[in-house]
Curated annotation (Swiss-Prot):
Residues 10-69, 100-103 form a propeptide. There is a cross-link at residues 70-99 (Cyclopeptide (Gly-Asn)). The presence of a 'disulfide through disulfide knot' structurally defines this protein as a knottin. Disulfide bonds join 73-89, 77-91, 82-96. Residues 1-9 form the signal peptide. This is Cyclotide vitri-A. GO terms for biological process: defense response.
Length: 103
């Protein structure tokens, strides 16, 4: 993960993947049919995190740390805490991870 982390620092904002964003939205309002609520949440998150699609980065993080930090949640936490904490993720080494032993 050491080679991937400096790339995070080059962004002006932390990053989050669409999959992580969707997981947070489903956790916050799993039965909500009101798209406006989700749109508002997405707009707030987009102001503090850059939404990126980069499964290669997630795979690289998982392979390089050999699961020591847990499962990558698809979000960085260089400047802003993990939004994915709503789904059990926490910040370790500037990347949000979920404990691999948690269900």
């Amino acid at each position: 993960a050491a080679f991937a982390l400096p790339a995070f620092a080059s962004f002006e904002k932390d990053v989050i993947t669409p999959a992580a964003l969707e997981a947070v939205l489903n956790r916050k309002a799993p039965l909500s049919n009101i798209m406006m609520e989700n749109d508002a949440i997405v707009n707030v998150i987009a102001n503090v995190k850059t939404v990126i699609s980069n499964p290669v980065l997630e795979e690289a993080l998982l392979k390089t740390n050999h699961g020591v930090n847990g499962i990558p949640c698809g979000e960085s936490c260089v400047w802003i805490p993990c939004i994915t904490s709503a789904i059990g993720c926490s910040c370790k080494s500037k990347v949000c991870y979920r404990n691999s032993l948690d269900n």
